[in-house]
Design a protein with these regions (language model features):
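Buried hydrophobic packing segments
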Residues: 30, 168-175
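Generic structural signal for well-ordered, non-membrane alpha-helical segments
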Residues: 3, 165-168
């Protein structure tokens, strides 16, 4: 269980929103508050041969555009475009350490951690996203394992309704560590 106290302590563990760390893309790690825990939003990307993350579970977000004054602008714009959620009405807790995608294309992604106090109404951009799921944080923590692909075994979160691996796995691993650190404070 993750208490409201831990959420407050999490703000001290995370980096400030202004710390962009040389990133060129941003994602929203959306934590929907519940009484004694939170759920995390995952989206499933549509299958698209030109998308290196085609069909994978992901977090809303994307690349910075020239019109974005900051990566916060990027995550606000991309989350609205993909999910219909207006993040500017929610509380930004901070950012995690940026994560590099691999192998290609190499993108440096800044994960913004955002607390949602209510259930947002989602309107998916069907050109980019197939579906979405909310997953209880405790299920994520308890679901770490390995998954086999044609190219070998990789670490993953094996959830009831999805497998999360790759760059999204790296980001989730960082929030799990941050919550653990906040719990010890």
């Amino acid at each position: 269980m993750v208490s409201a106290d831990v959420i407050e302590k999490l703000t001290k563990v995370l980096k400030p929103i202004s710390d962009e760390q040389g990133a060129n893309a941003a994602v929203a790690l959306l934590l929907k508050s519940k009484r004694s825990d939170f759920d995390v939003l995952f989206v499933k990307r549509v299958k698209n041969p030109s998308d290196p993350w085609s069909g994978q579970m992901a977090l809303p977000g994307g690349k910075r555009e020239s019109k974005d004054a900051s990566l916060k602008d990027t995550v606000l714009r991309e989350t609205l475009e993909e999910t219909g959620i207006k993040l500017d009405r929610y509380r930004f807790l901070g950012v995690l350490t940026a994560v590099k995608s691999e192998p290609k294309p190499e993108i440096n992604i800044l994960p913004f951690v955002v607390l949602l106090e209510d259930e947002p109404k989602l309107k998916l951009n069907k050109a980019e996203l197939e579906t979405f799921i909310w997953v209880p944080y405790e299920e994520i923590v308890q679901s770490q394992g390995m998954v086999e692909f044609s190219f070998g075994k990789v670490p993953a979160f094996i959830l009831a309704d999805a497998v999360v691996w790759g760059v999204t796995y790296k980001i989730l691993s960082k929030i799990v560590k941050a919550v653990e650190e906040a719990s010890r404070k």
